């Protein structure tokens, strides 16, 4: 018998087709806050009601945020038990860590269980796990905790991504694509779970950028299952992951920073984040869609991380997008706020559900090609080219 060549081994290891999203699940904590009531609640719980001018500013931020409600694990009871979390800069990392190391994997499990149920295959067929969170750090990590909580095989190959920030919903899909396409038969469970217990803090008039975060961020977890060469007798493909790229925007150092300190995770934003993103977004689009021969940005479907309303407004204006292009993105911002890495996966879920409800021809609002954008610290941009699948009547 002739020896097998390295080329033959490599060929046998690789999948034939592109990585495909096969299922999506989402979860939120039970507790939620309405944006209209939040300024009163926030200034009361942080004992800051004497800061009347700042409260007015915060109220305007909340009014302009385009957010209707946000889910939060932190209840009034938890905050009353941990007064240091309500200060602007008080040592509170231990208390925050104690919450997130338990709650982040737990919320991730809820989303993952929904995705696995929709997928329809036994969980023993999951070969790889990618877990992503900006909330807390621990060893062994959330990837290990989730493996135990779900009862995955101990031999599942795990990847733990901490402290990536808002672009990471694109990063996890990029990594899942590489794993699925280079390991024949691989089924990758991807989980993004975010809880604001690390970033919640009281107001201060010298750092309005911190206050912006308090007006935008919410809690949520999303999970997807990614694999190539789907078994269509059981699996239901939703989107193909055609290409994935990451870049650091020019002249954007320090535009978004996060620092883990004794006081928790502090966020710093420059005012011109929307301008930096909108100015550079077309370059990323051209690089991604040039090879496919697409240059009309209204001819594709859109999933964009909703960092805040100003980013969406400026991208829409710069690219002359029709209002309906960011419908799914704006809906998720309105109903959940900015859930960091989990957002784009919530938007994918929203889009495929709406397309099915409205009888559209494909999972991409009736269109074939689409883009998924993640924006975050760096400024880092993730660009994923998606191909929708026809919706069977």
UniProtKB/Swiss-Prot annotation:
Keywords: Acyltransferase, Flavonoid biosynthesis, Transferase. It catalyses: (E)-4-coumaroyl-CoA + 3 malonyl-CoA + 3 H(+) = 2',4,4',6'-tetrahydroxychalcone + 3 CO2 + 4 CoA. GO terms for biological process: flavonoid biosynthetic process; polyketide biosynthetic process. It comes from the Eukaryota. The active site is at residue 166. The keyword Magnesium does not apply. InterPro entries: Chalcone/stilbene_synt_C, Chalcone/stilbene_synt_N, Chalcone/stilbene_synthase_AS, Polyketide_synthase_type-III, Thiolase-like. The primary product of this enzyme is 4,2',4',6'-tetrahydroxychalcone (also termed naringenin-chalcone or chalcone) which can under specific conditions spontaneously isomerize into naringenin. Its EC number is 2.3.1.74. GO terms for molecular function: naringenin-chalcone synthase activity. PROSITE patterns: CHALCONE_SYNTH. It is an enzyme of class 2 (transferase). This is Chalcone synthase 3. Belongs to the thiolase-like superfamily. Chalcone/stilbene synthases family. Pathway: Secondary metabolite biosynthesis; flavonoid biosynthesis.
């Amino acid at each position: 018998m002739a020896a097998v060549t390295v080329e033959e081994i490599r060929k046998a290891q690789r999948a034939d087709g592109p990585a495909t999203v096969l299922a999506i699940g989402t979860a939120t904590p039970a507790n939620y806050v309405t944006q209209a009531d939040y300024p009163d609640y926030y200034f009361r719980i942080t004992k800051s009601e004497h800061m009347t001018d700042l409260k007015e500013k915060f109220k305007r931020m909340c009014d302009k945020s385009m957010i209707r409600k946000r889910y939060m694990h932190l209840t009034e009871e938890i905050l009353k038990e941990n007064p240091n979390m309500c200060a602007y800069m008080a040592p509170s990392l231990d208390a925050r860590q104690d919450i997130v190391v338990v709650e982040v994997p737990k919320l991730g499990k809820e989303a993952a269980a929904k995705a696995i149920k929709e997928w329809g295959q036994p969980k023993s067929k999951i070969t790889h796990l990618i877990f992503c969170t900006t909330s807390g750090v621990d060893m062994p990590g959330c990837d290990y905790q989730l493996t135990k909580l779900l009862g995955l095989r101990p031999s599942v190959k795990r990847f733990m991504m901490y402290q990536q920030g808002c672009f990471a919903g694109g990063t996890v899909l990029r990594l899942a694509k590489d794993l699925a396409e280079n390991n024949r038969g691989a089924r990758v469970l991807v989980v993004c779970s975010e809880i604001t217990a690390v970033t919640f803090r009281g107001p201060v008039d010298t750092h309005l950028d911190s206050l912006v975060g308090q007006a935008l961020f919410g809690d949520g977890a999303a999970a997807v299952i990614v694999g190539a060469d789907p078994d269509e007798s059981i699996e239901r493909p939703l989107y193909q992951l055609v290409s994935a790229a990451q870049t650091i925007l020019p002249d954007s150092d320090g535009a978004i920073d996060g620092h883990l300190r004794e006081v928790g995770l502090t966020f710093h934003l420059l005012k011109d984040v929307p301008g930096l993103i909108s100015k550079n977004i077309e370059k990323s689009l051209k690089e991604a869609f040039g090879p496919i021969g697409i240059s009309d940005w209204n001819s594709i479907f859109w999933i964009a991380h909703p960092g805040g309303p100003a980013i969406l407004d400026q991208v829409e204006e710069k690219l002359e997008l029709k209002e309906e292009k960011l419908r799914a993105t704006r809906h998720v911002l309105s109903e959940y706020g900015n859930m960091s890495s989990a957002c784009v996966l919530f938007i994918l879920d929203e889009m495929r559900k709406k397309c099915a409800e409205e009888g559209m021809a494909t999972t991409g609002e009736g269109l074939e090609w689409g883009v998924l954008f993640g924006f975050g610290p760096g400024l880092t941009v993730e660009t994923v080219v998606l191909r929708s699948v026809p919706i069977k009547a």
